Amino acid sequence: MLLDPLRRALQRQGFRAVNWHYRSLRGSIETHAAALTAKARALDEAPDVERLHFVGHSMGAIVVRSALALSRPRKLGRVVLLAPPNRGARLADLALRLFGPRIAAARELCSQPDSYVNRLAPAADLDCGIIAAAWDHAVSLASTHLPGERDHIILRSLHTLPLHRHAPAQVGQFLREGRFQHASG
């Protein structure tokens, strides 16, 4: 899957990384968030888990935000969102125009003011870093920002940010230090 190389790279950096999979076109974001909350609760109660960080890509970033709005783990660490459609996604807008409201993800992730993603609380109290893709045709740079974000960086990438060669180092840097490594000069 798309996040497997990132998971392996984070493991090489010393993180105990676990991929949690869901079917993006089946079920609502709230349904996925409830399932993620249950998984997070189990990890939060595990005695060998010191910190519980979250990394989400695209719709998965919104699932993470929604799950953390439902319940905050006691051991919550940092959150990294890659190409998050925090204010809606161009691709969802297009899907909504082409297919109508039949696709839940398109309804929930579109840029309309009353869409799920635009009603979701910004979670300004999260220790959250955001990585945006410079050439993302699904999510605009402006839509990636979130009030209260700790740091924001743009990588020269398409929407497939988890596969970018610098993404694992940037994610690890933020999880450890609470900031990204910005290019000097």
Task: Give the predicted meaning of each segment.
Residues A121-G185:
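C-terminal catalytic-base region of ester-bond hydrolases, centering on the histidine
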Residues M1, P5-R23, G27-D125, A138:
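Serine-dependent carboxylesterase/thioesterase catalytic core
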